[in-house]
Amino acid sequence: MRFLRLFGSFCLLLVAALSAAAQAQQPVLDKDYKLVTPPQKPESGKNIEVVEFFSYACPHCADFDPDLQVWLKRKPKDAEFRMVPMVFRESWKAPAKLFYTLEAMGAVEKLHRKVYDAIHKENQQLFTDQAVIDWAAKQGLDKAKFEQLYNSFGIDAKVQRAVAMGRAYGVQFTPAMAVGGRYWTGPSMVVNASGAADLPRFFQVVDQLIAMERGKPAAASAGKKKG
């Protein structure tokens, strides 16, 4: 009997400890994530929209991208991912136009990582229209078609909408990720004891925000800020 009582007490303590640990790992408002005010209407329909705000010119985005690609392979099935390039300075406009032109030509998957490497490993200055057009031609893309799309009103309009979207979401840095038009976070918000980005924990926060948007009871208290 004594053994059973001790075992029962141990189980209760274990459950309490696990519950406390789980609660401690819930994302904290204004620390691990922020609210989008006012909430924005996603473009994903029934699925939960997850947006990465990025720039090919951003070295942190280049470093973050391999971990993002790993997460994309295991992301929840009801999460629909898309990328939105930011233009925080004039030199970022050409890389933003490059992204949308690659998207229009169906070449993002093939050349996405190559753009990052060209800028951040090979020190290619892809910050002017001509530099981008010449680089694209060297990657085997039809130069005339690329240039026509790159300089089109449609691509300019997409860049303008991307900039407006970033402002509406309150995005202040890249990389950042938004969930469901209601929450946004970034690796620089989810840090370890030394102040470095905790990427495993960051993607856990993204998963939890997706769960919150989905409305799972387990995530109901996640939006409460700790006192």
Question: How would you name each of these model-derived features?
Answer:
Residues 56-60, 87-91, 117-122, 152-155, ...:
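Solvent-exposed loop/turn segments at secondary-structure junctions
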Residues 3, 139-227:
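C-terminal cap of thioredoxin/glutaredoxin-like
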Residues 74-105, 109-137:
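Structural microenvironment flanking redox-active thiols in thiol-disulfide oxidoreductases
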Residues 2-93, 207-227:
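Extracytoplasmic thiol/disulfide redox context detector
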Residues 54, 83-84, 116-119, 147-148, ...:
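A short, structure-level motif marking secondary-structure boundaries and short turns
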Residues 65-72, 95-99, 112, 129, ...:
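Extracytoplasmic/secreted envelope proteins and their assembly/folding machinery
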